[in-house]
Structures are given as C-alpha cells and as structure tokens.
C-alpha cells in the first residue's frame, strides 16, 4: 500500500482537507473511493483514474454527477504520496495557476521533508 499524506503549510493548514470538508457526502465518498485506488495502486493507477500533469505532478481524476474534481499529487520516498491541491474542474484543461500551485507546494514540502514524513 502507498501512504497518502495531505500537504500542510508550515502553520499546519491543510488546503486539500479544507476543500474536502466543503464537499457534500456523496462527493466525499467518491473522492474517498478514488483515494483508495491510489493508495492500492500508486503509480500503476492510470487513466481514466489518474494521469501525469507535468514533471512529477500527477492528477487524480474524479467524476461525480455533473462535477469533475482534480486532485494533484506527487510521489515521494518510501511509497509516500503527497496530496498537494484539489479543485473543481470547469474547463477542458487544468489551469496553469493550479499546476503552478501544486508545484510550489511540492517544492515547499520537499524542502521541509526531504526524506518524506508527516506533520
């Protein structure tokens, strides 16, 4: 199994967790099901569930009713998956600002936890 870790800021805030708290019960259940697949399959999880975005950043592709969510993440040492960003997708392609945010959070995480770890 892969260890899923929510990105947290230096202050201890978890933007992904905060976003998930705002979802309704059905949407949270769908996200949880996709996270279970990621936890089980790691980098072997492919489309339609996951895809490479750019560099080390990947996306978990979640469709629930008429909503589409994208959770951006990267793999770190010891089978660790760091979940950096989640968004409600309204356009055909991910916005550059969302990709850049995930990359900044990845850089921040790797700087603070170069060998992996959790808060």
Tell me what each language-model feature is.
Residues 1-68, 77-81, 88-119:
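Basic, Lys/Arg-enriched alpha-helical interface segments
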């Amino acid at each position: 199994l892969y260890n899923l870790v929510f990105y947290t800021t230096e202050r201890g805030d978890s933007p992904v967790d905060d976003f998930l708290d705002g979802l309704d019960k059905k949407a949270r259940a769908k996200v949880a099901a996709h996270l279970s697949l990621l936890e089980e399959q790691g980098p072997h999880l492919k489309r339609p569930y996951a895809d490479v975005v750019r560099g080390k950043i990947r996306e978990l592709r979640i469709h629930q009713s008429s909503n589409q969510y994208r959770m951006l993440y990267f793999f770190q040492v010891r089978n660790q998956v760091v979940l950096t960003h989640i968004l409600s997708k309204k356009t055909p392609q991910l916005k550059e600002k969302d990709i850049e945010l995930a990359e900044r959070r990845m850089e921040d995480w790797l700087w603070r936890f170069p060998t992996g770890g959790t808060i």
